[in-house]
């Protein structure tokens, strides 16, 4: 299997595919017609080459994927707004008047920051607090770190299971599998057509979900080694080490994606 460098994600009723600075989004509209949008995005690691250094680039690559993903998702959502939702409220009109063309970028930034804070709280700090309850009966730091890691993975799995029960999310997950099929079709040297895509696997090594799982596993190794005396230092370490863990995880996933 040949590495293609192509990535992507599912959006509302469609998929986004990216190769280098170029990306395209295909969305099936309510009338059944498929709308395609092509665009470019220059990575921050291209603008500032020193950010592309191994173990540093992972964080910025993740940020790039978040930005492109949000742009694609926002565009796909625009086809499914109700007439009532399409009408701007007075507050929305005021925001549009104050910020103008920058409004979409500002709102996207706010959503990304809020999502990041929520993710830290749910997947990094909550497992730490839950495992801390067992501190009196489990004196071993190593066992505590492993327990925290397993709780973190359990919370993530439960979260995925819960959201996948929602019809809209379930359908989006199906498109996520379609994205994997397209990439696998290309990387196996097959012509990109419906028959070959259908026959391709819906699993892929460079999947974003795999990245999150790798982050969680590697975080166990980090927190087994790094010892802190107080709960406050534990909180700080969980937050401060996120870029480091993400950087190591990215290199691992990148290596695995390029080798069978």
Residue spans for each PLM region:
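Cytosolic juxtamembrane amphipathic/interface segments immediately preceding
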Residues: 1, 5, 10-11, 45-52, ...
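Divalent-cation
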Residues: 1-81
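Residue-level signature of catalytic and energy-coupling elements of molecular machines
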Residues: 14, 169, 207
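Hydrophobic alpha-helical membrane-embedded segments
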Residues: 50-75, 148-172, 245-258
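Juxtamembrane "helix exit" motif at the C-terminal ends of alpha-helical transmembrane segments
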Residues: 75, 115-139, 215-239, 246, ...
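Juxtamembrane inter-helical linkers in multi-pass membrane proteins
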Residues: 83-95, 171-197
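Membrane interface segments of multi-pass transport proteins and intramembrane proteases
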Residues: 91-103, 131-147, 227-236, 256-260
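Select subsegments of transmembrane alpha-helices in polytopic membrane proteins
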Residues: 105-123, 204-215
